[in-house]
Amino acid sequence: MNNESLSIGSRIGILTIAFLGWFFGGMQIGMTNLIRNANKFLISESGWSANLNTEQLNNLIDKWWAFQQCGFLFGAAAGGYIFGKLGDKIGRTRALGISIIWFSVLTLLANFAGDPFQLLCIRFLACLGIGGCWPNGVALVSEAWSKIARPIMASLIGMAGNIGIFSFAKIMANYPVDADSFRNIFLLGAISAPLGVIILLFIKESPTWISSKDATSSDNNNKSDSPSVFKKPYLGITFIGITLATVPLLGGWGCFAWILPWASEVGSAELAPNILQTRSIASIIGSGLAAVIAVRVGRRSCYFVSCLF
C-alpha cells in the first residue's frame, strides 16, 4: 500500500489540516514572543512586585520572559520527540490531532495562571504539543505527497507557521492587551481545538505508515535492530544536522527574540508586534524562495546560503 491509494481529495485534505495545524502552531509561537506583558500583569496581580523599584521590576519581568522562551524551546524539543515517537506507534494522523488538542487545551488552562511560575509550567506542557505538531504534520504530508519534492512541502508548512505568527502579531498590534484583557490571548490560543477533533474523526491515516506498521508487525524478531538516527550509519549526519540547526535558532530565538522586549521599553505598545509582523513577512518570503532554490540547486547549497543570510 502506498500514497496512490489515497484519492486526490484525501491528499488535499491532509495538506490542508497540516497547514492549518502549523498555522495555529505559529500563533502559539507568536504568543510566546509577545507574552512579556502577561508576565508583567501576573507579577503585579500575584504581589511579587511589592517593594520593588522600577529597575528591579523590569529585571524581574525580563527574567520570567526569558524563562518563557526557554520553556517553549525545551517543551517543543521534548514534544517533537515524544509525539514523534507516538506518531510512529499509533499513526501520524492521530498523533497530529492529539498534539493540537493538547496545546489548545493547555493554552486555555493558562487563562487561570495566578503567577509567572504557574504560567511557565502550563506553557511548557502546552509546548509539548506544539513541538509534536511539526514532525507529525510534515511526516503525514511527505508520505501523502511523496512524488512532490520535499522542500516544496516543507516550505508550505513552514509558511503556514509564519502566517500564524503574523496573524497573532497583527491581532496584538490592533488590540493591545492591558491588565484587564491580557488573559484573552490564552482564549485566542485555544481556538485550534476543533481542528484536532476534526483530524481525529475525519482524516485518513497515511497508507505509507500503515504499510510500514504492517511490515514491522510481521517481522518483529529483530526489534532492537530497527533503524534509528542515533545509530550508525546515521549517527554522524544526525549530529551534523543538530549542529547546523542551531544556527537559525541562535539567530531567531537567541538574538531576535530580545528585540521585542527592548522595543516594548523604548516604543509604543504596537512596536513589538509590528516588528514581529515584519519578521514574519520576511520569513514567509524566505520559505517560498528556499523551496525554489533547494529544488534548483540542491538542499545543501540552499541551507548554506540561508545560514549566510
In which residue ranges do the predicted regions lie?
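Glycine-rich segments within core transmembrane alpha-helices of 12-TM secondary carriers
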Residues: A149-V177, S192
